């Protein structure tokens, strides 16, 4: 039988148990930090030469020169033709739905003119070049290409550079096909911290980017953290999470499989069921034990459920909402009768899946909203990846003579108060005598 925590929100010591459940070690440690810093320094100083060495060492792929790291566009198109029609159709439908959704996120420039003629506004522009990291090998995820590339392209980013490791020369056709569909401009066979370094600093072959996005292992996550400041990054993602709040009226098999959909990602993933119905909680537990045996990732799921899973019984809806907002889950399912009525009370969640028919997996692939979401309680202060992550804002100010006269007097007084005489003088030069 699966050994999952069964908790009552009213029990003594519940808060301590909850904190232990949610605790997650940082994405890095001293050993990883040292390795990553060495890789970053090496790539920054030696460029393509270092990339070729690391590719041979870690991916067992020997290439003669830097230009061999690039996968030609013709290969992307060939991969698109090679994959089965149902996969191609699925990728294209997913890309279109993600595009349709993200087009509604585009920020627009705006401005207004005050009575004295002073012009104020905000100009929105896109990033020039973005780097997309995609995990490679047999565990490659073409959905990651779609979710990261489409918002960048919708934002208007003119150049999107993708890096994907190809261990032993193994290329994942679905990943390359997704890159072709999404309009990725250049693809390099690079992985690990060295790929992040190449994107951040540039080499003779790989152009430097303005922002690095995309998931990766502990070395990739640590490298992204290290290069932040030189370039922007999307986020440092922790293990995948799902919290299902159910009123007891949904098929327990559905809920069990929804919990497994995140647990199968890796052994550190977290799956939590919150319900007011203790009998239903037990039904879900029985379903979990029945269904886990049917899945090829049974071992991973069992470890994740044992180490970080929980079934939590609450007294009422208000207690459930308080718990949800405290946990701030990456994925939240509201498997209840009137989920929309609960929305005003839900403050912290990466994505909210409403109703009994909305499996979280639909959001992972093709619903439309982005599947790159804040984890480890960071939904308290951060948001899903979107078009706005590939746009930036510039403030616009143009003073009329009359406006400069009025504002100059105010700025002069404030600058004097801060002891900044050059500021005060600069403002007052524009003041009429």
From Swiss-Prot:
A Pfam family matched in the record: Histidinol_dh
An example Gene Ontology CC term for this record: cytosol
Cofactor dependency: Zn(2+)
Binding positions for NAD(+) per the UniProt entry: 133, 194, 217
Cofactor annotation remark: Binds 1 zinc ion per subunit.
Residues noted as binding substrate in the record, renumbered to the chain: 240, 262, 265, 331, 364, 418, 423
Amino acids binding Zn(2+): 262, 265, 364, 423
SUPFAM superfamilies registered for this protein in UniProt: ALDH-like
Gene3D superfamilies to which the protein is assigned, alphabetical: 1.20.5.1300, Nitrogenase molybdenum iron protein domain
EC number: 1.1.1.23
EC supergroup of this enzyme: oxidoreductase
Coiled coil region boundaries: none
Pathway the protein acts in: Amino-acid biosynthesis; L-histidine biosynthesis; L-histidine from 5-phospho-alpha-D-ribose 1-diphosphate: step 9/9
One biological process term in Gene Ontology: L-histidine biosynthetic process
Catalytic reaction annotation: L-histidinol + 2 NAD(+) + H2O = L-histidine + 2 NADH + 3 H(+)
The keyword Transmembrane is assigned to this record: no
Keywords: Amino-acid biosynthesis, Histidine biosynthesis, Metal-binding, NAD, Oxidoreductase, Zinc
Residues annotated as catalytic: 330 (proton acceptor), 331 (proton acceptor)
Function text: Catalyzes the sequential NAD-dependent oxidations of L-histidinol to L-histidinaldehyde and then to L-histidine.
Family: Belongs to the histidinol dehydrogenase family.
Protein name as annotated: Histidinol dehydrogenase
Organism: Hydrogenovibrio crunogenus (strain DSM 25203 / XCL-2)
